[in-house]
Regions:
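Mixed-charge, low-complexity intrinsically disordered regions
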Residues: 1-99, 111-120, 124-226
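Conserved positions in beta-strands of structured domains
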Residues: 104-107
Length: 226
């Protein structure tokens, strides 16, 4: 049996140009996203009625991890990056088919732009340019299980850090980008095995390099470059 051929229906534009700093799960940080359909699928009829839903599912491809192949076991960040578990017990990108699944907030469907229809949303956990393979509406009556167990994750987003972001540096970003950036930093983008309070990290966001340190549960932004 031949392998299925996936059609890329759209690509998402996000503030993240690199993998470092991208939220580990969707919905953790309200970062803006813009979904632009590929020309064969750029049809207003295809999204008719979608604006009635507050959230959507995005099925997408870990295109930057495909060349590295898959692994039966991985080391999830929630376990400190040292303990291995099965890949199917995680959302690791190193999967046999390299597919990702994200629930994001749908803010609006734009129909008056040159490349319309365009979807605007928040909460995506993807690098800018990531290929989208399918879009489905989120159905709260079918997709939400409040009593579900979370396995080794504990069922929550984990501890969030305090963010000290000097106002003059935060002002370098558009108003629509600021809250998402603060949330992404609060979610601790560092590899879990790195805990050096003297180390300066750099995260690209919105075309700028955010330089910061982490000490005693606080992210201290020290510079914004670019």
């Amino acid at each position: 049996m031949s392998a299925p051929a996936w059609d890329i229906i759209a690509r998402i534009e996000t503030p993240f140009d690199q993998k470092f700093g991208v939220p580990r799960q969707s919905g953790i940080a309200a970062c803006p996203g813009r979904i632009v359909f590929e020309k064969p699928f750029r049809d207003a009829d295809a999204v008719r009625g979608l604006e009635g839903f507050s959230h959507i599912w995005l099925i997408w491809q870990f295109d930057r991890a495909l060349r590295q192949g898959w692994s039966p076991t991985v080391r999830p960040p929630r376990l400190g990056g040292n303990e291995r578990v099965g890949v199917f017990a995680t959302r690791s990108p190193f999967r046999p088919n390299g597919l990702g699944l994200s629930a994001v907030e749908l803010e609006r469907v734009a129909r008056d732009e040159p490349d319309s229809p365009v979807l605007y949303g928040r909460g995506a956990d993807m690098v800018s340019g990531t290929p989208i393979l399918d879009i489905k509406p989120y159905l709260s009556y079918a997709d939400s299980y409040p009593d579900a167990s979370g396995g080794f994750t504990g069922g929550d987003a984990g501890g969030m850090l305090t963010v000290d972001f000097p106002p003059e540096l935060l002002a370098r970003f558009d108003c629509g980008q600021r809250q998402g950036l603060i949330c992404a930093l609060a979610a601790d983008p560092r590899p879990r095995y790195l805990d050096d309070p003297e180390r300066v990290y750099g995260m690209t966001y919105g075309g700028r390099n955010v330089r910061f340190t982490v000490s005693d549960g606080t992210v201290q932004v020290i510079a914004v470059e670019g």
